[in-house]
């Protein structure tokens, strides 16, 4: 019986003590270890299984952490974490107080650059390489590992374009598996496919034309071949590029056959690969599905409706429309800047454009939102999925900045629905005709109405622009909520001893604010509490404070929301507790709120 090798590897120095012929066994053990832990603790499975051999080869050939290794996005970095001093606490991955699901500089010296968003690795590694040269270190290696979906993003090309005119000691490794979270799209994907199939002559190679020493494509699961090629490239100075071909989910049959589902499958059987299905009976719908079903229903009736997503057709549920109306629903790849300006161009031609981008990823297209959309007052409909705290993906993925970064933009309307009905109704209302851009923000996960699809779906009501509503009367304190966090207020008031003293107002329109109802609130209540699931600085509460100051009101105002710090990973409920906006914290607050 073979002895266990992985349990004796604490860091890459231990890995390098092994004979090369032992590394295949390490790969088998590492792949199985990832499967066993992720099957119970959840996480990003497929990407990490696909680069097991590459991970081992990199840490075996290069002198990490002296040589600097940057993983793009980080979905594929579980093997890297396990081999770099975190095997024993890998079971805490993505849990509150545990290790991050992504490389993180403050966590470990082997994590040279914090990642989570796409296409940053080449620029980061190039920056490190140029810095090393300026410091007189000409031997240090700088490696960027990037996927075929990420390299199609504009920022990756910017990095390649710069690197190609330097003599920086950088190695870019393209992990080509033809899929990101969803299948890769675009002309570059077709080009890479032709290269893999041997149909593209080497003299036409796009990477060689950028002055990189190009090699490949080679089998990314052939450890001896990988090691041999990395050793060869290590001796070459200047920009180098290695194209490897891998299979996402390698080593688990179901993950290889259903790569989208097994990107992050939840809990599953480590032996059979079967996903432990959760019963969805009597559960509310996911907000993403409310969007997906509603836009498809509206698009069937209105030929001007267009849907756009940057590489998130499944996660946004725009896939419903893409499957039925493919000519009017577009996955543009990991290209948020392009997605926004594409939407703007369509809007100039009187199309009704729903641009669905995760809140955290719209940050990548901020200039386009201002310059190409708002400045021209084009009626683009931004649907910001994953707004608020998203949970285990942590600080890189929380959608907590959108209210603050959008509220300052002229012409921009911001709407945060309380529930599924408000979401479908605002999606309906905007296609009736608007003369300004609007951002509709809603969270990851499920709503609050189990019977929405049967009782409410398709029964549309027009929403009046800028109107807030009183959900509950009170005598002493007014609670003003923006968005789905208002459901925590509703639940807390059911259990608060002095609920009769507390009024609740739903401000779905964060911009423009309902000044009429605000004026009534400030004249009626001495104390006002605002609550949001975004940052407090510059958010909804700040807008209420600005109204108060400009109208010379002296009321006591308490702002609840996300504090001025980056919130780490954990369940949404755990993170809401940290920010004191969960139901229990609100019950405690309301119990003292009228004193």
Residue map of PLM features:
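Glycine/charged-rich beta-loop-alpha catalytic/anionic-binding loops adjacent to active sites
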Residues: 32-39, 100-115, 137-143, 319-333, ...
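N-terminal amphipathic, basic-rich helices that act as targeting or association modules
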Residues: 1-83, 208, 217-223, 240-243
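Active-site nucleophile and cofactor-binding loops and adjacent substrate-binding regions
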Residues: 42-51, 71-75, 103-124, 146-150, ...
């Amino acid at each position: 019986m073979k002895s266990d090798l992985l349990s004796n590897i604490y860091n890459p120095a231990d890995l390098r003590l092994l004979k090369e012929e032992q590394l295949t066994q390490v790969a088998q053990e590492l792949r199985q270890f990832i499967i066993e832990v992720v099957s119970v603790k959840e996480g990003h499975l497929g990407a990490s299984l696909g680069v097991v051999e590459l991970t081992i080869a990199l840490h075996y050939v290069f002198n990490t952490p002296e040589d600097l290794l940057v993983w793009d996005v980080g979905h594929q970095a579980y093997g890297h974490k396990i081999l770099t001093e975190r095997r024993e606490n890998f079971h805490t991955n993505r849990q509150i107080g545990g290790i991050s699901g992504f490389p993180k500089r403050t966590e470990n010296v082997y994590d040279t650059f914090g990642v989570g968003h796409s296409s940053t690795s080449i620029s980061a590694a190039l920056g490190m390489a140029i810095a090393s040269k300026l410091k007189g270190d000409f031997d240090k290696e700088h490696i960027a590992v990037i996927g075929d979906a990420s390299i199609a993003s504009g920022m990756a090309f910017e990095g390649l374009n710069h690197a190609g005119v330097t003599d920086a000691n950088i190695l870019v490794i393209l992990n080509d598996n033809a899929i990101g979270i969803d299948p890769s799209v675009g002309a570059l994907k077709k080009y890479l496919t032709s290269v893999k199939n041997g149909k593209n002559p080497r003299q036409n190679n796009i990477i060689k034309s950028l002055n990189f020493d190009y090699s490949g494509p080679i089998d990314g699961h052939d450890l001896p071949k990988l090691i041999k090629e990395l050793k060869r490239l290590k001796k070459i100075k200047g920009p180098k590029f290695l194209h490897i071909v891998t299979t996402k989910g390698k080593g688990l049959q179901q993950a290889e056959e259903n790569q989208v589902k097994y990107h992050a499958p939840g809990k599953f059987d480590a032996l059979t690969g079967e996903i432990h299905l959760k019963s969805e009976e009597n559960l509310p719908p996911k907000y993403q599905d409310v969007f997906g079903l509603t836009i498809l229903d509206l698009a069937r009736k209105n030929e001007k409706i267009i849907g756009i997503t940057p590489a998130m057709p499944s996660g946004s549920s725009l896939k419903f429309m893409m499957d039925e109306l493919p000519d009017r629903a577009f996955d543009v790849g990991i290209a948020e800047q392009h997605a926004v300006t594409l939407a703007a161009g369509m809007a100039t031609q009187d199309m009704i454009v729903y641009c669905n981008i995760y809140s955290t990823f719209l940050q990548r297209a901020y200039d386009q939102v201002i310059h190409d959309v708002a400045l021209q007052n084009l009626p683009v409909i931004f649907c910001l999925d994953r707004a608020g705290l998203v949970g285990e993906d942590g600080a890189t993925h929380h959608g907590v900045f959108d209210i603050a970064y959008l509220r300052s933009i002229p012409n921009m309307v911001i709407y945060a629905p309380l529930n599924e009905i408000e979401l479908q109704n605002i999606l309906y209302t905007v296609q009736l005709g608007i003369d300004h851009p609007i951002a509709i923000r809603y969270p990851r996960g499920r709503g609050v109405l189990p019977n929405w699809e049967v009782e409410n779906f398709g029964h549309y009501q027009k929403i009046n622009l800028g109107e807030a509503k009183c959900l509950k009367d009170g005598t002493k304190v007014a609670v003003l909520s923006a968005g789905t966090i208002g459901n925590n207020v509703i639940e807390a008031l059911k259990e608060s001893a002095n609920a009769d003293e507390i009024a609740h107002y739903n401000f779905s329109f964060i911009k423009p604010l309902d000044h009429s109802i605000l004026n009534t609130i400030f004249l009626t209540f001495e104390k006002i509490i605002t609550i949001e699931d975004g940052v407090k600085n510059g958010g909804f509460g700040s807008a209420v404070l600005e109204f108060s100051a400009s109208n010379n009101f002296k009321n006591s105002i308490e702002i609840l929301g996300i504090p001025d710090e980056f919130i780490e990973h954990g369940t949404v409920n755990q993170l809401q507790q940290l920010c004191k906006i969960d139901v229990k914290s609100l019950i405690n607050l309301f119990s003292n709120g009228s004193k």
